[in-house]
Amino acid sequence: MAISPLVLLGTVVLILLIIGYVEASNHHRIIATIPLRIHVNGTRGKSSVTRLIAAGLRAGGLRTFAKTTGTAPRIIDAEGKDRFIHRLRSASIGEQIRLMRYFANEKPDAVVMECMAVQPEYQWISEQKMIKSHIGVITNARPYHLE
């Protein structure tokens, strides 16, 4: 008895949908353990503003982690120490999910994330599906990366 290609395709699609649902549910459960999430976006100055916000929160007694992007992406830990992020492949907004899991395991009071998405569609995904910030910060908005 041969399996119809349509049945096989439908089964594969169903399995992928279930896997996607489980991953999304797990991610939402993980980020819900972070009491304060701040997402910094804008054309210029995101890394500096991310660092300043994180330093201010730490000075106020909150256990705060931060992540900056760019050519030298860094994690700023709860003590304010920079750690370089070694990437094995090119930058992708998907790394935000892995970092949120890492931060949640560290039991922070707050996480400050610099938006690493360039295209508006990816910025929306990064905010609405990955970070789900309590506070959004826009440093400035100028035409850039329009190619």
Regions found by a protein language model. Name each.
Residues 1-41, 48-55:
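Short, basic phosphate-binding NTP loop
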Residues 40-43, 64-65:
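PAPS-dependent sulfotransferase catalytic core
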Residues 45-46, 92:
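Charged, low-complexity surface patches
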Residues 28-34, 56-136, 140-147:
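ATP-dependent carboxylate-amine ligase catalytic core
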Residues 46-50, 73-76:
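Short N-terminal binding/cap micro-motifs at the start of the first secondary-structure element
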Residues 44-45, 112:
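Alpha-helical architecture
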